[in-house]
Amino acid sequence: MRTLRVGIASYEQMKARTLAIARGNYKPAAGEPKVWFTSAESFARVLSDRNRALLGIIAESGPESLARLAELTGRKKSNLSRTLKTMERYGFVQLSRGVRGSIIPRVPYQNISLTLPLSKPRLPGTEAA
């Protein structure tokens, strides 16, 4: 079962971690988050109950177009397009072109695991703040 690991960290922490990785000073471990949000609130907005339900419908029904997904969900194509593009930026969904330019959504993970620090997080590869 594929699980996407998500973490919460400040912009400054994410930047420092990325630079440490780019310089070769830090190599992320296999179990570390692959996707980062700057707050639990931003994570909750992207993966709201409605959007998690949308991911479930995509995973279960495998719609071959946004038009079909709109039929299954009762949502407008324009709304779906915006939502899916946002989720694609975070890796929650993959969008590919089908026949005649249709957009085919796919969910590459069965689970999403959130690492939520209870104290000020210190990312591996960053200096102590």
What are these regions (language model features)?
Residues 9-11, 17-31, 112-129:
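Amphipathic alpha-helical dimerization/coiled-coil segments
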Residues 26-53:
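Short alpha-helical segments that sit at the start of domains
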Residues 44-48, 65, 95-121:
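Short, cationic-aromatic polyanion-contact patches
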Residues 50-63:
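Short amphipathic alpha-helical interface segments
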Residues 58, 69, 84-90:
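Basic amphipathic alpha-helical segments that dock to polyanions
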Residues 63-71:
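Short acidic, hydrophobic short linear motifs in intrinsically disordered regions
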